């Protein structure tokens, strides 16, 4: 088989997407991209401005390829988007792409982008980095060394920093974009948003806020599920079965989140379900005594600080 050979047929031309780094988030992005394409059994209308021609997964080894294919069986079988693979050749994977997702480990960014031939392969292309704590400036430095300029005759790539989460697999990611103003920002902007809408909702912030956004939207998933697990275990200790407790706790959290998404302030939701001296107030008293608010705020702050340190370290290494 040529680098990759698991393909579905599609007659619709469009853009080729390459994903560099097929760990948890990279795999989730591939799943979301494939699921955004029409199902093989349906003649669904095109929902997006830029149809996908092919998704290319860049993997390190044949073992990783086999593992990835197993995790993508449902998407490969159910959707019309062709899926291809490139093994141990990031430059070739980028050369074939119109859009590149950078989803490797942050410490591997320089290795992924600094290979021989990468400047030529990446020239003029949209690069969407989902690396937490690695700024656009650091990635440009990795591609163009100390000059941060493309070689003569080469168009610069356009790097966009975006924070997504693994809900991208279900097209439910909250993706936040910090797009730096460059000469081709507007040219690439509509393509970038169209691609990211395939993974969920898209919002924009200034680049300096990205560490805090990453702590909230990416790491925040783990913080929410840690609290969710604590609620589940509390209910189990009171006699509920774990399956029932898990479902009820998750639905309760989703209901509270939907109320806030609909416009209610979190404090208003709390007040609405709390009667002074009642049973909910008794539980909230315990949470206040444990200083849950302060601990949670400290977790966000600690994560944000760590992300800034990661970027500083990456910048020194590139």
From Swiss-Prot:
EC annotation from Swiss-Prot or TrEMBL: 1.5.1.-
Pathway(s): Mycotoxin biosynthesis
One BP annotation, GO: L-proline biosynthetic process
Keyword Coiled coil carried by entry: no
Gene3D superfamilies reported for this sequence: NAD(P)-binding Rossmann-like Domain, ProC C-terminal domain-like
Keyword terms of this UniProt record: Amino-acid biosynthesis, NADP, Oxidoreductase, Proline biosynthesis
Gene Ontology molecular function, alphabetical: pyrroline-5-carboxylate reductase activity
Leading EC class: oxidoreductase
Claim: Oxidoreductase is one of the keywords in the record: yes
Role summary: Pyrroline-5-carboxylate reductase; part of the gene cluster that mediates the biosynthesis of UCS1025A, a member of the pyrrolizidinone family that acts as a strong telomerase inhibitor and displays potent antibacterial and antitumor properties. These compounds share a hemiaminal-containing pyrrolizidinone core fused with a gamma-lactone, giving a furopyrrolizidine that is connected to a decalin fragment.
Family: Belongs to the pyrroline-5-carboxylate reductase family.
Name of this protein: Pyrroline-5-carboxylate reductase ucsG
Organism: Acremonium sp
Gene name of the record: ucsG
């Amino acid at each position: 088989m040529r680098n990759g050979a698991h393909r579905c047929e599609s007659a619709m031309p469009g853009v080729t997407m390459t994903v560099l780094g097929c760990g948890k988030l990279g795999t989730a992005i591939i799943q979301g991209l494939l699921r955004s394409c029409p199902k093989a059994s349906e003649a669904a209308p095109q929902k997006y401005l830029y149809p996908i021609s092919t998704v290319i997964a860049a993997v390190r080894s044949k073992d990783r390829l086999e593992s990835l294919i197993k995790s993508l069986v449902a998407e490969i079988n159910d959707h019309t988007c062709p899926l291809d693979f490139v093994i141990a050749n990031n430059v070739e994977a980028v050369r074939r792409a119109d859009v590149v997702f950078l989803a490797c480990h942050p410490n591997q960014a320089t290795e992924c982008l600094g290979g021989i031939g990468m400047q030529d392969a990446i020239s003029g292309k949209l690069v969407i980095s989902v690396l937490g704590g690695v700024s656009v400036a650091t990635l440009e430095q990795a591609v163009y060394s100390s000059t941060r300029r493309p070689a003569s005759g080469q168009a610069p790539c356009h790097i966009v920093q975006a924070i997504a989460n693994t809900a991208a697999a279900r097209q439910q990611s909250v993706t936040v974009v910090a797009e730096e103003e460059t000469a081709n920002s507007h040219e690439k902007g509509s393509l970038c948003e169209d691609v990211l809408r395939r993974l969920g909702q898209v919002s924009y912030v200034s680049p300096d806020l990205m560490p805090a956004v990453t702590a909230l939207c990416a790491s925040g998933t783990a913080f929410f599920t840690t609290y969710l697990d604590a609620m589940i275990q509390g209910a189990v200790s009171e006699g509920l079965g774990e399956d029932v407790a898990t479902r009820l706790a998750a639905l309760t959290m989703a209901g509270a989140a939907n109320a806030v998404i609909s416009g209610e302030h979190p404090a208003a939701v709390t007040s609405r379900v709390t009667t002074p001296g009642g049973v909910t107030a008794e539980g909230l008293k315990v949470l206040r005594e444990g200083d849950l608010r302060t601990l949670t705020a400290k977790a966000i702050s600690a994560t944000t600080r760590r992300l800034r340190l990661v970027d500083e370290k990456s910048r020194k290494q590139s």
